[in-house]
Amino acid sequence: MTRTNRTKYRPYLYRAAYVAAGFTTLVVLFGLAYIFPAIAAALPGVQPQGHESPLGNLLLGTEYAVVGLGAAFVLMMSLPGTAADTMRGMLKTFARRFRLLFLRVVRALGWRSYTLRDLGQMVLPVAGLVVVMLLVNHWLAHLPLGPGWVPADEDPRIVVTDNATVPVKFLYNLLHAPVLEEVMSRGPILFVAYLLGTDFAHRSVRPWVRHVVLWAVIAVSVVTFAGLHAFANGSNVASAGFGAVGLTWLALRYRSLLPAILMHGFYNAFVAFA
C-alpha cells in the first residue's frame, strides 16, 4: 500500500479499530455480567438468588447497568469521529455527537408518533402471542420432565414484589422488567436492522451478508435472553426461548420495541396476578 493510499484510508482504519475495540469491550462486559451473580453470591452479606437481601439485590442489579454502559460505549464508537472528539476533550462536539447518536438510536428502536390505527393493528398480534406463550407454559408444565426441568416454587422476580402494593406490582411487571429486557435483548436487533437498511449498507454490503449479520444478531439475542432466565430451571429457559422468537418477530414486524414491550409486560402482569 502506497503512502497516499495509507493516508486516504487511515480515517476508516481508525474508525474500524474504534468499533472493534467497542465490541470487544461489550463482549467482555457481557461475560462479566454472566458470571457476576456467582461472584456476588460469594461476597459477605450477599445471599443466593431466591433469598433476597438488599446488598444482594444491589450488586446483582449492577450487572445490567454495566452492560448498558458497555452498549452505550459501542454505539458511541459507531459514529464517525466520536472517539477522536472525546479523546481530544471536545465536550461541545461530543455533546452534539451524543445527541445525534441518541436520536438515531431511539429512531431505530421505534420512537415515533403512533395513531390509534397503528396501535389497533398491534392489538391482535400482541394478544395472540400472549395466549401462545401461556399455552406453551401450560404445555411445558405438564411434560414428564426431569428434576432440573420442573418449574421452580418461587420466581425470584416475583418474590421481590410480594409485599408491594398492587399498583407497584403492576408497574414493575408491566414497565420495569419488560422495558429493560426489551431494550437489552431486542434493541440491538432493531439497531442492526436500522443500520443494514441505510443507503450506505445497501451500497457497501452484499444482500446475503446483510441477512447473515441480522440472523446472527437474532440468534445471539435469543440465546442470551433464554440464558438470562436460567435462574430456576430448564423449563423457564425453554419458555423464554419461545418468547424471544415471538418478541423478535413483533419488533422487526413493526420496526419498534413498543409491541414487544406491550406483549412482554402484559404477559408478566398476567403471570404475576393470575
Q: What is the predicted function of each stretch?
A:
Residues 24-41, 76-77, 133-138:
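Alpha-helical transmembrane segments of multi-pass membrane proteins
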Residues 14-30, 124-129, 218-223:
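Alpha-helical transmembrane segments
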Residues 40-58, 83-178, 194-208:
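Juxtamembrane helix-loop-helix connectors linking adjacent transmembrane helices
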Residues 161-274:
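Transmembrane helix-loop-helix hairpins at the membrane interface
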Residues 1-11:
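Short, Lys/Arg-rich, polar N-terminal cytosolic tail immediately upstream
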Residues 33-41, 85, 186-191, 236:
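Short helix-terminus and kink motifs of transmembrane alpha helices
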